Amino acid sequence: MKNKKALFIPLFIIILFIAFFNKIINFIINIKWFKEVNYLAVYFTKMRAIIILMIPIFIIFFISIWMYYKSLIINKNKSVVDIGLNKNNYGKKLFFIFNFIVSIFLAYIFSSSYWYRILQFNNSVDFNVKDPIFFKDVSFYIFKLPLFESLYKVIISLLLFLVITTFIAYFILEAKYKIQSRKDINLKNINHGIKSFAGKQLAIVSGLIILFISFGHLIKIWNLVYSSNGVSFGASYTDVHATLLFYKIIVVITLISSIVTLLSIVKGKFKPVSVCIGITIFLIVSQNIASFLVQNFIVKSNEKTLEQPYIKNNIDLTRKAFALDDIEIRDFDIKNDLQKQDIADNKASIDNVRINSFKPTLEFYNQVQIIRYYYTFNDIDIDRYNINGKYNQVFLAAREIDTDALNPNTWQNRHLIYTHGFGAVMNKVNSVTSEGQPDFVIKDIPPYNKTNIKLTNPRIYFGEKTNDYVIVNTKINEFDYPREDSNKTNKYNGHAGIKMSFINRLLFAINKKDINFLLSKDIKKDSKIIINRNIVERAKKIAPFLTYDSDPYMVIYNGKIYWIIDAYTTTNRYPYSEPYDSINYIRNSAKVVIDSVDGDTNFYITDKKDPIVNNYAKIFKGLFKEEKDAPKEIREHFRYPKDLFSIQSKVLGKYHVKDPGVFYNGEDLWEVSKDQKHVEGETNTNDAPYIIMKLPDQNKEEMVLLNYFNVMKKDNMIALFGARMDGEQYGKKILYKLPSDKTVYSPYLFKQKINQDTNISKELSLWNREGSKVQYGDTIILPIKNSLLYIEPLYLRASGKNSIPEMKRVILSYNDKLVLSSSIQEGIKEIFNSKDNKINDKNEKDSTKTIDDSKLKKAQEYYNKAIEAQKNGDWTKYGENINELGNILNSIK
């Protein structure tokens, strides 16, 4: 027997090891990786918290269950107990093992589920904003109430578990006793049997359940700030004057009932227990009836008056939660009285107007600049740089390796040779080539650079498409970039990666389920494996509690490529705040900066006033750095994130209204303007553009994220909403309210104006023929002083799989003038230099008459040949024909 016991423990350990083998391997690798990225302390925060919590929770569970068990066997008058439990010590030993396993399991489940809430509770940071009903700081609802709710659910679940296990134990033991004594089971005696077996225990548990029902209704009282019963989110008139009153009564009555129940047990009386349970149920039902009566017979007919104070609470706290309470609001009285001097004063704004559009530019990048089939550009980023002494807005993108496109896609190619992307492409947003394509200032491999921006190490080991591991410093040279006659190779000189010792090779072979780690002769002791290379997944791995922006963007600094990811703190627990997309509070509290070569990942706090990020900083010591610790050149490229701006714009459409009466009527709702990408295409929500502009009353251009608002379900533009981001102005928001008594063209209405212009629509019809298609670019509405200048790039796309859209014309509109021009500068001249600010149609017609018909035919011939070459993907012939076309057009001038 002793030998069997001696074998049991090691056998049990072996079984556990096999069951958790993969998790153990993952755990070891995680330790190595977090140590490599210098965030091991962050990783151990969770583990340390779970272990520290498990010990006292295990003791509480174990003692509670053991005492309950002892109370069941203490009565030796019942034979069922004598036979089932107290005959010998075997039952006690068996229950001890059962209790140990159950207690440690429950302790682990509780600790791993609620460690974070407990740490949030202990590290709570005040918001210095109180809710208007209970006058508690908002921090109570975000950091403390969730823990109270969790404790309530766990304790109620445990008490119900005890009740259920008591009944199960009774039925098992009763059945065993009847079988052993050869007596029939009599269901009529169950009630008496239960009382004799565990009457007092069940009564105590019932008393505790009633006590925690009292606590549960106290939680319900606090949760009224999240009520959705009224006309606005948060506690309504009915909630405050009916539901709250009944909840308070239930809290008091159930508290008294729990005491009465426990006293009744001491006196051996069970009837008061039933009465207390009955009263509790009656009050809960009565609360629902009372709330229904108040809502339908008092509130419904006087709703606007009675709900106004609660609507105001909702407005004020929703605006605070989404950071809309600090918007600078100005009236924008459209005068359309611009003079030539105004244009000259805003030359930098006009020179930076974006005539390149995102989708066509990305298509062009992926057709012309990928160089080889295994490269790709994931997306286009927009930013501002001082290029050769001038402030410019630019498009830029990183050239990454698409490992899925490799051919052959072997293990060596995928993980040892094609380890990194190479280089970046940049073009100014305000200019195109004579063919209507982006005018590059950085392009090709190795980089051809016309700027003062240094890019000496353009390798991309960490990016948006780097979804697989690589092994560097192997016996095989890494592919660096292609050359005409051969490939340039490279040896990794960064410090990222985990050394590939034999033990580590074995660990990764198991983890990746790949024997190549052990069989490969190319891997040396000095080789390193780089994992978690996708920049967003890398940030999530380190700080999974943050929410990350959908659009990371690249920055060129210190000769290398860096990535910036906007990180958000969010919650759905902000009192009285209307939820949008499952959250009712958001702050862009941190920026994550990642080195594309070394993988260094730094989290910088950019909003010190946010209590949630400060709470995280207290919990995860060593994770965050101050914003000032980021290099100045990196900080200059921090952008106001579009994801945040999009949510704020959605909220602002309803919550720009501060008057509760107007809010109740719903008479002043806005929506983000619609737009149209094709001449006869469907409409969709306009994508907010980043614009270089000089705000009214400012003397310097800056980058602003701008959204256009319409009246709900109307196309008339009613407001401009902007977020600033340069220098000390970062994060400041401004709302320009447009006159409501005038027709102000929204992007969609502007498109309709274009379609209705006979001269322009005729041109579009000619272009939009069979074989080619006209496509709108990104609409820009540029405020200049008290006027609006509309800019719309026009693209022409030939039919065919490999066709590339070309920016052919720009439509400009100012006041009632609409011109179709070859460039913004030409369009501006046409609008502001023509006599009496009118377009001289006669001169245009006269100039047209002087053009030689033979040249026109020749131009048409070269154009058709170019389109045909484009369809066939023959870019050499395409370029030749376009050059010939350009020569003819120049001769016509």
Curated annotation (Swiss-Prot):
Any one Pfam family match given in the protein's UniProt record, by short name: UPF0182
Transmembrane regions: 9-29, 49-69, 94-114, 154-174, 202-222, 246-266, 273-293
Main localization, broad class: membrane
Annotated compartments: Cell membrane
Domain of life from the UniProt record: Bacteria
GO CC, one annotated term: extracellular region
Tagged with keyword Transmembrane helix: yes
Entry annotated with the keyword tRNA processing: no
Membrane disposition: Multi-pass membrane protein
Keywords (A to Z) from UniProt: Cell membrane, Membrane, Transmembrane, Transmembrane helix
Entries under NCBIfam families matching the protein: PRK00068.1
Family of this protein: Belongs to the UPF0182 family.
Record-linked HAMAP family: UPF0182
Record protein name field: UPF0182 protein CLM_0018
